[in-house]
């Protein structure tokens, strides 16, 4: 009887984990789709990752970041290479949540800068390597040309700075709505997540 009850709890916990991961991946996909429809020079594909990092902790948010890039890789194979960046952003988001950086303004801006350093600078270096020591083309590269002219920077420095600036705008655009969504979640739902074995931080953290 006890074994059956344990099995049911495990099954329920895994279903809950699957649900929160699917929600996060879905939000990331919707953000990416919205960005494409609006024609913005951003990404908007981290709302789900950040929301899940605050609500569900490290395991589900890393899973969300990884599978979001894996799914995007179906249409854009290069997206899979950025999975490591998404995982780093997810881990950083969990730390920022634990330190209550995400939930307070203007402290939230520090989190945005951290995410942009990971997504913009590290992501920029990864782009440079993937494209054979080239940053490719597009809005960010055009911005880099203007930065190079204005500040007399070399090709790599101007492009990395452009990547960082664009990513600051992107991470601000996804951090604000993800925090607002988190604040709207019922306390009972958050308590349910925090009672699961995959929620590694057991100490109650409040919002």
Model-predicted regions and their roles:
Residues 2-55, 59-70, 75:
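Hydrophobic transmembrane alpha-helices
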Residues 50, 61-65, 79-83, 108, ...:
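Alpha-helical transmembrane segments and their helix-entry boundary regions
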Residues 65-72, 94-99, 199-207:
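Extended, non-catalytic scaffold segments that flank or surround catalytic motifs
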Residues 56-60, 74-81, 96-101, 120-124:
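Juxtamembrane membrane-interface segments at transmembrane alpha-helix termini
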């Amino acid at each position: 009887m006890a074994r059956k009850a344990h099995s049911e709890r495990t099954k329920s916990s895994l279903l809950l984990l699957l649900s929160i991961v699917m929600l996060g991946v879905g939000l990331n996909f919707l953000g990416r789709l919205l960005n494409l429809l609006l024609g913005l020079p951003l990404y908007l594909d981290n709302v789900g990752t950040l929301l899940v990092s605050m609500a569900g902790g490290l395991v589900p948010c890393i899973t969300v970041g990884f599978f979001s890039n894996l799914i995007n890789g179906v249409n854009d194979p290069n997206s899979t290479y950025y999975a490591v960046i998404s995982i780093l952003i997810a881990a950083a988001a969990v730390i920022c949540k634990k330190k209550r950086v995400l939930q307070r303004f203007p402290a939230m801006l520090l989190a945005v800068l951290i995410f942009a350093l990971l997504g913009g600078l590290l992501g920029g270096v990864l782009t440079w390597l993937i494209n054979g020591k080239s940053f490719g083309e597009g809005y960010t590269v055009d911005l880099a040309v203007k930065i190079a002219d204005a500040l007399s920077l070399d090709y790599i420095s101007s492009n990395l700075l452009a990547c960082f600036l664009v990513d600051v705008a992107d991470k601000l655009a996804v951090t604000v709505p993800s925090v607002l969504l988190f604040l709207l979640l019922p306390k009972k739902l958050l308590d349910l997540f925090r009672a699961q074995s995959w929620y590694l931080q057991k100490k109650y953290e409040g919002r």
